[in-house]
Amino acid sequence: MAKNRHLFTSESVSDGHPDKIADQISDAILDAIISKDPDARVACETTVTTGLVLVAGEITTSVYVDIPKIVRDTIKEIGYTRAKYGFDAETCAVLTAIDEQSPDIAQGVDEALESRSGSEIDAAIEAIGAGDQGLMFGFATDETEELMPLPIFLAHGLARKLTELRKTNKLDYLRPDAKTQVTVEYDEFNQPVRIDTIVVSTQHHPDITQEQIAKDLHTHLFPEVIDASFLDENTKYFINPTGRFVIGGPLGDAGLTGRKIIVDTYGGYARHGGGAFSGKDPTKVDRSGAYAARYVAKNIVAAGLAKKVEVQVAYAIGVARPVSISIDTYGTSDYSEQELIDGVNELFDLRPAGIIHMLDLRRPIYRQTAAFGHFGRSDLDLPWERTDKAEALKKLIVK
């Protein structure tokens, strides 16, 4: 590798990975509830293991949803439809342990500190306080058209295409569980120049050979996802490097909601506040705050105000306004952090109810985000991925 070059690696997983099964079940339940009761409070956690799904958490709503049916339908859609996979939508046990939201938390969310103290005029927006304290990050970079880091973008692309090859029976020996990983080489100007390593581990029928899997992935997977200009004779491929991946899914490993937070975001390329997304209604700033931070970051880059930017927002439980906003452009902007923050404060309402209104989050849009990443999804119409404020932001800041 040339001097001053460096490598960066990100991974993704398929929708059949145990942790992603759990995420998708949690978000499918959230969508079912929020479609009937947009103001519901949902914190839904799922764990999956051999032959068993446990759904637990705090849900406050006046509507009924058939949780066992949602669980089974989600598992079936993912592709676990045979008992020999060790996990089957029809025969797995489904247990539920659901409580209402704590009244101590509800008090602060129902009526924010600013509203309770009479310190705010904007009652409708100030009425909702943050559902918890915490810090969230949003990130954008001009490495890709989607304004995502290239390693995670390619890792997601491989995982999504692998799932498509399985579900369309193009490669009918594939089974639902899979992981992908891409290592990108960057030059001295921090621009991606080549792919150094690709790792794919995919569950498969026991009778297929590893040689056949490798041949098929080189024919049907890699050319469909990765630009050939990034590949060379030194690119390394590791396909099922253990030599066998027959036992997978919840039979191989237990899964839990919220254990793939780096896969869900930027593949480790940007910092993470630690809060997971799936199963949480939009009053939970772990989710809505991270979406808003991505929205801000993406519009900053789309406006040409920076080539790369990380936005941090932080909240106190029961308080509507963020306690802090931080913007780091890594030296790629001609404008100061304060100039950018002033423009963001002018255009983006980062109070919980403001985010919910700005991004129209009280809708059943979450199940589709629970696999293959929440950001950079050109295959979905996600409100936080829009760059509709870029021009207005540019006019505010560029004098």
UniProtKB/Swiss-Prot annotation:
One GO molecular-function entry: ATP binding
Cellular-component GO terms for this entry: cytoplasm
Subcellular location: Cytoplasm
Entry's EC annotation: 2.5.1.6
Catalysed reactions, semicolon-separated: L-methionine + ATP + H2O = S-adenosyl-L-methionine + phosphate + diphosphate
First and last residue of the signal peptide: none
Entry-linked PROSITE patterns: ADOMET_SYNTHASE_1, ADOMET_SYNTHASE_2
Cofactor requirements of the protein: Mg(2+); K(+)
Cofactor: record remark: Binds 2 divalent ions per subunit. Binds 1 potassium ion per subunit.
Binding, Mg(2+): 19
Keyword Zinc-finger applies: no
Binding positions for K(+) per the UniProt entry: 45
TM segment ranges: none
Gene Ontology biological-process annotations: one-carbon metabolic process; S-adenosylmethionine biosynthetic process
Residues annotated for ATP binding in this entry: 17, 177-179, 244-245, 253, 259-260, 276, 280
Pathway where it operates: Amino-acid biosynthesis; S-adenosyl-L-methionine biosynthesis; S-adenosyl-L-methionine from L-methionine: step 1/1
Keywords: ATP-binding, Cytoplasm, Magnesium, Metal-binding, Nucleotide-binding, One-carbon metabolism, Potassium, Transferase
Family annotation (InterPro entries): ADOMET_SYNTHASE_CS, S-AdoMet_synt_C, S-AdoMet_synt_central, S-AdoMet_synt_N, S-AdoMet_synthetase, S-AdoMet_synthetase_sfam
Subunit description: Homotetramer; dimer of dimers.
Family: Belongs to the AdoMet synthase family.
Protein purpose: Catalyzes the formation of S-adenosylmethionine (AdoMet) from methionine and ATP. The overall synthetic reaction is composed of two sequential steps, AdoMet formation and the subsequent tripolyphosphate hydrolysis which occurs prior to release of AdoMet from the enzyme.
Name used for this protein in its record: S-adenosylmethionine synthase
Native source organism of the sequence: Listeria innocua serovar 6a (strain ATCC BAA-680 / CLIP 11262)
